[in-house]
């Protein structure tokens, strides 16, 4: 996946060329909250100086994590090794201590914030060009969350635990009052048939995932 600073200009260019058309759809995929964490070198962290909760990754827990081997453990952040990447200098290859674990969590948080900044740029464009109207639907979601120390796993989504299964789902839909929050259990496999129903198009009972 490409970083947001490469994706967003293409998004804005596409909107400039197609935004005035009727019945368009644009799918935008941002990779920045995904490992390797790759916010630009000059992007200022918004989370430095915020300590880990005392009851989260304690010294005893982290010492145990250092004994683990395998994909995305503290000793092998990058799946099978502790390599680093010149193009992503912020991303570590291994975690030596709790401070390094905190740094990795900050990088993830920065990736989420950076993605949010870029989504904001797209929404600002829509609003400033008269495209954010009563007919526009916007869906912001993800395919997975991220483990950041749970079960000794860092920067990975290979387990069906709560941090991995908990994803954002923000929907702005024509004719639906905003500001509502639904707290019940939902599954993102329901998104496609739900959108089809809202659009009044044909739905099928044989979806395969």
Residue positions per predicted region:
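Catalytic domains that recognize anionic headgroups
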Residues: 1-209
């Amino acid at each position: 996946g490409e970083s947001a600073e490469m994706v967003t200009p293409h998004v804005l260019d596409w909107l400039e060329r197609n935004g005035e058309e009727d019945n368009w759809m644009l799918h935008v995929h941002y990779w920045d909250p995904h490992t390797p964490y790759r916010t630009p070198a000059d992007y200022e962290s918004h989370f430095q100086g915020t300590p880990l909760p005392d009851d989260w990754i304690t010294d005893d827990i982290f010492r145990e994590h250092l004994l683990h081997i395998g994909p995305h453990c503290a000793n092998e952040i990058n799946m099978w090794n502790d390599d680093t990447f010149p193009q992503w200098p912020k991303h570590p290859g291994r975690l030596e201590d709790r401070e390094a674990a905190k740094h990795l969590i900050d990088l993830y948080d920065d990736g989420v914030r950076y993605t949010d900044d870029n989504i904001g740029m797209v929404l600002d464009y829509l609003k400033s060009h008269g495209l954010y109207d009563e007919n526009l639907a916007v869906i912001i979601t993800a395919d997975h969350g991220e483990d950041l120390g749970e079960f000794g796993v860092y920067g990975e989504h290979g387990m069906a635990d709560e941090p991995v299964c908990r994803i954002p789902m923000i929907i702005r839909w024509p004719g639906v009052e905003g500001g509502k929050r639904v707290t019940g259990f939902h599954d993102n496999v329901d998104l496609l048939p739900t959108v089809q129903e809202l659009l009044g198009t044909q739905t099928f009972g044989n979806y395969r995932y």
